[in-house]
Amino acid sequence: PPRWRQPALIARLLTDPRPVLDELRTAHGPIVGLGAGPMRLAVVGDPVALRELFGTPVDAFRWGHRFNVLGFVVGRTSLIVSDGPDWKRRRSAVQSGFSRRRLNGWVGDIVDRTDACIDGLVARTGGEPAVVDLYPVGRELVQGIVVRTLFGERLAARSGEIAALFQTAQDYLESPAYRQVPHPLPIGRRARVRADLDALRAIVDEQIDHLRREPSDDPLDLLAALLADGSLRDEEVRDQVITLLGAGLDTTAASLAWLLWCVALAGPGLWERLRAEADDVLAGDGPFDASHLARLDLADRCMREATRLHPAGSFAPRMAHVDVSVGGYRIPRGTLVLWSAHLAGRDPAAWTDPSAFEPDRFLHVRPEQKALADLAWVPFGRGARNCIGFALAQMELTLILARLAQRLDVAPTTDREPRAVGMVVNRPAGGVPLRVSRRP
């Protein structure tokens, strides 16, 4: 773009990214350079270029750079602001917490908590048709799952308090005030954010102290698993847990909202197909495990299609530590690379009718298109720095959708798609009001 337009484009990109990303691709293609000097950006949304980017050694990039706004919230030892040997050690410890056995154990808990959420919704509406914003309903469900997953049953009852403390910081990250450079002094709103973060860290520190005194035998408690691993200091454990809380709360809740909106708008035929699948797979009272999840093929395709269209993050940053080559372009050291799941997920070369919600597209992708489509589905990233909790997030979205279809009727109240808002998390403005009733 012309240099005189670039400051305004960058400002819009950091406040309302999706329209700007679409404009840049239409005008200049899926790889675009912006800015100069210390504010040099490269937007990368081409699927083939992303394969090259994700395949570049992680040491060629830095995540603990001055533009990583999340470090303020998650702590200085967090995975998402770590580099080099420290990152590798922390990543290894946290990755071990997402073992196959632990993921398998979380399946039943997700179904049980979804049932409790549905019971509460039915009690609230009397089972009669009512318009309900399922975004906050889903968010409360997700926060219960995430807090129980991270902290075990002891703190599960405090999930609302924990989520509210984190939400203060999340809202601040999305505000224009946070993106001031230099950042404002710790007064007013920023001071309140710090106070809530301090309160959240105190809760986690107290739970760590408790588990040091009384080790947990709960096989599903991720915090207990990190402490038992022994390779991280207590501060590191705390920062990773808060990172996982942030990564698993707002992002999954927003993805669930978009998923429910897409499926509801697709019409009753898709909902009936989801119900038939769930009736077959999730019959009875359980126990349910990963073998049941693997059979929810249609629900999984709906999850994949909704996250393709509406990834939780429209772009993610990494700073080039050395000169790198991506998609035939030289990206100089010091460039902030913004790779975009939004652009890749709507790439017209990878997807037929890319703006349409078509879960069955994954069944009949043309052979010549399949490899490109595989590269273009990156809502959870790819490579060594992908989303570490992607398996849990996909599990939650798939199981929640299947159980809702099994027990409720859901229909849209309008065919107007919600406006996507948010720089850090892509969420639907105004929520997702849907007509909900108990299954006949």
Residue positions per predicted region:
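Cytochrome P450 I-helix active-site segment
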Residues: 1-3, 107, 111, 164-167, ...
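Cytochrome P450 heme-thiolate monooxygenase catalytic core
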Residues: 62-70, 86-88, 102-254, 273
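Cytochrome P450 proximal C-terminal region
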Residues: 25-26, 114, 118, 166-167, ...
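Alpha-helix/helix-capping structural signal
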Residues: 47-48, 101, 145, 342
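N-terminal membrane-proximal hinge/A-helix region immediately C-terminal to the signal-anchor transmembrane segment
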Residues: 1-77, 82-85, 89, 111-116, ...
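Conserved cytochrome P450 K-helix/beta-meander segment immediately N-terminal to the heme-binding cysteine loop
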Residues: 339-368
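Cytochrome P450 catalytic-core helices
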Residues: 251-277, 390-408
